[in-house]
């Protein structure tokens, strides 16, 4: 590509969705020529979180995406410049506004790193857009991460002192602290449930454990289905839907147990 087109060699970016995102990340990890990756609904090729990478990362995930938890864990572990945007939806490409936000974020990172000159007018325009997005959030717990992200993204490009002070104050709010802790508890329970179901699936292969494992799996699936079909949206409903999509996806590759596969088909969610 670099030979065929006139491209700024300091600004090679890659992107991909799901498996394509893993390929993009793998290429970026294997060379020092990639400035950044937009990773849609999947992260590293081995799905293992890293503390840092030599390129910037903008990740996206739907609230009911079966790779949602993976992307959240990537976000929590990574300390080098990155951002995660979550949108309402499943395992799909991000909506247009999120895709545009990803490109805008890459421009900010390029200015911060010196890969492109600082454009004060663009910085101000993107800051105003970010302020509008922050003010449109209905909850304080939802506002805090956006404020923190704005401070990180615009530090060195403009004055962020007022946003920093507001984020600091919100970070001490007891209701906000509890809401964020609740999110982490839901995430932890999601990971435990998936691990438990994988263990029970393995038990289906052992005659002495099969009956008990099948019964336990049905109990978990019944509980998840009840939460997944709750009328009101909640972190628990989103988590249940993600788990159901995770365990029903590729089930025939993990087990040949016909009774279990029929059970999963009964609980499979629509797109």
Which residue stretches match the model-derived regions?
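Gly/Ser-rich "nucleophile elbow"/oxyanion-hole loop immediately N-terminal to the catalytic nucleophile
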Residues: 1-18
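Short glycine-enriched nucleophile-adjacent loop
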Residues: 21-32, 37
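A conserved short beta-strand
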Residues: 32-45, 55-56
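Short beta-strand/loop motif that positions the catalytic acidic residue
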Residues: 58-61
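Acidic catalytic loop of the alpha/beta-hydrolase fold
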Residues: 63-69, 92
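C-terminal catalytic histidine-bearing segment of alpha/beta-hydrolase fold enzymes
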Residues: 72-75, 79-144, 148-149, 161-171
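Short solvent-exposed coil/turn linkers within tandem alpha-helical repeat scaffolds
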Residues: 89-93, 150-166, 170, 207-215, ...
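Alpha-helical linker/edge segments of TPR/alpha-solenoid repeat scaffolds
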Residues: 112, 167-195
């Amino acid at each position: 590509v670099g030979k065929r087109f006139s491209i700024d060699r300091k600004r090679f970016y890659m992107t991909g969705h799901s498996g394509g995102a893993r390929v993009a990340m793998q290429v970026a990890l294997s060379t020092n020529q990639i400035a950044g990756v937009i990773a849609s609904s999947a992260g590293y090729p081995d799905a293992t979180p890293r503390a840092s990478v030599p390129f910037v990362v903008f990740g996206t995930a739907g609230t009911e995406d079966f790779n949602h938890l993976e992307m959240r864990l990537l976000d929590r572990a990574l300390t080098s410049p990155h951002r995660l945007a979550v949108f309402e939806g499943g395992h799909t490409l991000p909506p247009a506004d999120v895709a545009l936000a990803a490109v805008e974020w890459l421009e900010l990172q390029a200015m911060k790193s010196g890969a492109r000159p600082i454009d004060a007018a663009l910085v101000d325009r993107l800051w105003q857009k970010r302020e509008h997005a922050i003010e449109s959030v209905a909850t304080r717990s939802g506002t805090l991460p956006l404020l923190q992200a704005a401070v990180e993204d615009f530090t060195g490009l403009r004055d962020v002192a007022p946003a920093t002070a507001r984020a600091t104050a919100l970070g001490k709010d007891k209701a906000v602290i509890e809401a964020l802790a609740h999110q982490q508890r839901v995430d932890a329970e999601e990971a435990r449930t998936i691990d438990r179901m994988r263990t029970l699936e393995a038990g289906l292969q052992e005659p002495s454990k099969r009956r008990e494992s099948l019964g336990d799996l049905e109990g978990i699936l019944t509980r998840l289905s009840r939460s997944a079909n709750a009328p009101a949206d909640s972190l628990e409903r989103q988590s249940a839907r993600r788990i159901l999509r995770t365990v029903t996806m590729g089930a025939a590759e993990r087990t040949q147990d016909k009774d279990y596969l029929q059970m999963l088909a009964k609980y499979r969610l629509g797109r």
